[in-house]
Amino acid sequence: MNQSLRNLAGSLAQLPGGRRTKFAVIAVWLVVLFAIGPLAGKFEDAQENDPADYLPANAESVQALDQLDGFPSDDEADAITVFHRDGGLTAEDRAAIEQVRAAINDEVRGEINAERSGTVAETGPPLISSDGATALLTTPITVPEAASGDAEDLLTDTPEEIKAELDSLPSGLEAEVTGPAGFSADAVEVFNDINGTLLLATGALVLLLLIVIYRSPIFWIIPFFSVLIAEVTTRGLGYLIADAGVTVTGQSGGILPVLVFGAGTDYALLMVSRYREELRRREDKHDAIRVALNRTSPVILASGGTVIAALLTLSLAEVSGTAGLGPIGAMGIAIAMLAMLTILPALLTVAGRKAFWPFIPRVGTEGADETHGAWRRVAEWVARGPRRVWIGTIAVLAVMAAGLVFLNSDLTTGNMFRDDVDSVQGQELLEAGFPAGANAPTNVVVTDTSKLDGVREAVAEAPGVAEVSPEVERGPGGAKLEVTLDEDPYSTAAFDLIPGIRQAAEEVAGDDVLVGGPTAEEYDLRQSAARDNRLIVPIALVVVFLILAALLRAIVAPLVLIATVILSYFAALGVGAFFFENVFDFPGMDPALPLFAFVFLVALGIDYNIFLMARVREETLTHGTRDGTIRGLAVTGAVITSAGLVLAGTFSTLAVLPLVSLTEIGFTIAVGVLIDTFIVRSLLVPALVLEIGDPVWWPSALARGAGPRPDERATGRIAMEPES
């Protein structure tokens, strides 16, 4: 490990390991907690979940939105109330619909407009379908761009108020609220419940795992409290970062606590494992924690730094939601790492060895590391036939990766909920009597109005266009046409229509026309996400390779590690795609999932490989590559496996949430971590290192061989040591 990391570790060890300074460390963290804690509760308020907020400024749909500034319908979103009866609406139904309309205009509109600065416009007469079975009431809602948070609640509160007027409808008459405002209300309701649910689920799981791992009724409190402080601090600083302009979405807000709990607990496991070993060697707990910090801090700093660097590559993304996850996630890892290297060891020192009751580590006793025997047997089994092992594991990973044939990116705003929410049910009712795109028309903005008629005719002939509105809305930026599509405006089929509409309009008006609206925004978002994949994936690999090369002082070993993690990634994505299609029956995969999964699995997979290979390199210096690999795997197996189970468990808690995208992210990363823990790190990496031999350390001096000590060369035995 680099000398600079060791120097930093030595400096860190003096604070939480000091007889007086340990209390100062705890006091500083408590001050930070009380200062930042109140901001943590505001973290959800800083989240943005409108696709238009994620797009780069040069996206055509964003330019169209900017061009509409000053139009009568600027900043307007509709709440569409859909009524439907199989066989046709009755006279009683139509009378009830008129009563609902009157209630919206008199009670809902009057009450909301009196309390907020936004505007709920008058709801016009119902639009009846040609078959007489479906009716629509459209309620325009306008929220000024600079409106307060109270005014912005119009988009969520108005649909809820309208729903309250639907309780007394005639039997058999179905009614739901949909449209952009309806989808917004459902999304906000789901995202508002995410953070509390996720925090409870993640915290409960980590608590349970800590109790099982340490088999102590009290010791779990120390690492759990340390991780909880890191999580609260991260959320508070996350609010400040979001307030400074970094985009935080509900998705990244859901991932953040999982990342902090998982990584923080992993680092805690490594620290506690070494501290417990040192308590068996040293009577003074202060000496024990200082040695433990000196030996584990460089590895934790190196692995955490690698994860931070990988996450920061997300900052290069065009999609601001993805770019925002970079600094937010990196900050979470940094705080978790800092907490586990400061307040955790300080609390461990204050508590002393009695905190481990009933399994108290005493000086001179043997280490209670029963799994070392099992992991030594695994290591020696790999060493007896490394070629057989790496060929077999690659074959298994290839079979898992074959699930990629089920990969599709059909998950959209319209089907992102795991449960049938009102807006989705309303869309289904709407499609029974109207073109599917009536829910959210596509906007065509013509800046040169002399070309308006030509654009209208060209767009009307474009594939997938049901109709172009006869009304023309005019404003400072030109004129706007509303285009209704044949497809659900939030479906991939509708997204695929946008290029044809743009081409048809541009053939007539050139640069004087822009196509926007919800469907175009989703299309542009997917295009930007694809661009982000092409840019960030190779950059992340190069960054991780350079860090590994510096840490291991080699080129071959980092290439081997990166290759194995890439295999692990494709295997995890393949397993995920298979389960999403054939077991969970999800409509598709989130387009952002491959990039998120890649960055997280590369970062976290390399994380565990650093834990392993740092020890292997250390052992190789004395025992040679073969014996060093066996020793390294044997003495790190138990703690890294525990860490992998904790991290996989924390990511699996995302599955409790009602959003398909977060469930997919949690499942894929959890599977990937388990693959990396039990297959890649335990079998594939050691087998490849043993197969390659000393050249794996090229171009360092180790590539020329560093044989074992003479006494071990003579006996052929490999002496086991406690983990360091």
Feature locations, PLM:
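Structured non-transmembrane domains adjacent to transmembrane bundles in polytopic membrane proteins
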Residues: 57-76, 86-181, 406-588, 610
